[in-house]
């Protein structure tokens, strides 16, 4: 299969604002694109999604996604095949409007359609009310909410999407290309990251091409992703609410939403959860992810000199000759290049000075170090506050070994 890349210009995509100021900006999505290559590319992608079982790669504000119609099992299976994704790893569904989400949920409740449509606030009748503060504050954006599958005999999405569970996650992406594609195709898209399974998530179209060339028909190139890590996934169906996967919206931001969300906790995986009989509720809860070919060593609460000493000891214990290794280093706030031995072939990359910069650069830099042929990547850990929770979640899953130093 030939994989084509079509460039889209986000400046040409616009959305009509609602006439009612009290209405959510994306209660209904009306997209406007003048005749252009961008419009042709989006119409081509929408045609593939509607009329074939092949997935299409497209940019979101978090990472590039690989999408197919969440309602059609054969289309969803094509995502798993292209990525070589484990069958028990569920997918997140992407919608372009609250109206589209409402229609998707109502499709599973045919007896309730006429009754719900007569309600003045039908979105509140079908979407669990606990999520309304988050939807108002964070949608569109990098937040996924867990919804119930009420009738397993008539689910709103393919059972492949849910991995056979009684819940599924859904979000409304912020990226104009993602919103336009979902709106034009009028298809709720099941879309994990558009990379080969276990590889670092793609934040550029070329990352997608490197992993999935020959396996998918089309990549929409909308430039670099702005957030750089996947969405936060929350479960508000339990008390207290739980963050199942840290991501683009921080714990602190969610807790500031008030109500039940003030008590939000973070899911912590047990070692037993990683066994084969554990079925994750959302992506990112079970399998190793985000890993480059090089071996990643994560150092928590270590200075650069102490980290290098631990690394030398690690190589000695593994029987690895240090002089034959090419070493990459990812620094953030404390480490600096001058503190490492000058006689060793290090490749230094600075992830950034704050959480926003680090999340945006992390996956791209892991891929960059792979391209430079390093054997090991030494990574400076960060504090698990704000964006740091998602950063350390991703680094922990990418790392072969995590070294914990004394807390300061």
Swiss-Prot record:
Superkingdom, taxonomy of origin: Eukaryota
Database matches in SUPFAM superfamilies: YrdC/RibB
UniProt keyword Cytoplasm, yes or no: yes
Chief place of localization: cytoplasm
Example GO biological process: regulation of translation
This enzyme's EC code(s): 2.7.7.87
Annotated localization: Cytoplasm; Nucleus; Chromosome, Telomere
Keywords from the UniProt entry: ATP-binding, Chromosome, Cytoplasm, DNA-binding, Nucleotide-binding, Nucleotidyltransferase, Nucleus, Telomere, Transferase, Translation regulation, tRNA processing
Pfam families: Sua5_C, Sua5_yciO_yrdC
Any one annotated GO CC term: nucleus
Domain YrdC-like: 39-249
Enzymatic reactions: L-threonine + hydrogencarbonate + ATP = L-threonylcarbamoyladenylate + diphosphate + H2O
GO MF assignments: ATP binding; DNA binding; double-stranded RNA binding; L-threonylcarbamoyladenylate synthase; nucleotidyltransferase activity; tRNA binding
Family matches, as InterPro entries: DHBP_synth_RibB-like_a/b_dom (IPR017945), Sua5-like_dom (IPR006070), Sua5/YwlC_C (IPR038385), Sua5_C (IPR005145), T(6)A37_SUA5 (IPR010923), TC-AMP_synthase_SUA5 (IPR050156)
UniProt enzyme class: transferase
Matching NCBIfam families: L-threonylcarbamoyladenylate synthase
Family of the protein in this entry: Belongs to the SUA5 family.
Its job: Required for the formation of a threonylcarbamoyl group on adenosine at position 37 (t(6)A37) in tRNAs that read codons beginning with adenine. Likely catalyzes the conversion of L-threonine, HCO(3)(-)/CO(2) and ATP to give threonylcarbamoyl-AMP (TC-AMP) as the acyladenylate intermediate, with the release of diphosphate. Required for normal translation, by ensuring translation fidelity at the level of codon recognition, appropriate translation initiation selection and maintenance of reading frame. Also involved in telomere replication.
Protein name: Threonylcarbamoyl-AMP synthase
Provenance organism: Schizosaccharomyces pombe (strain 972 / ATCC 24843) (Fission yeast)
Gene giving rise to this polypeptide: sua5
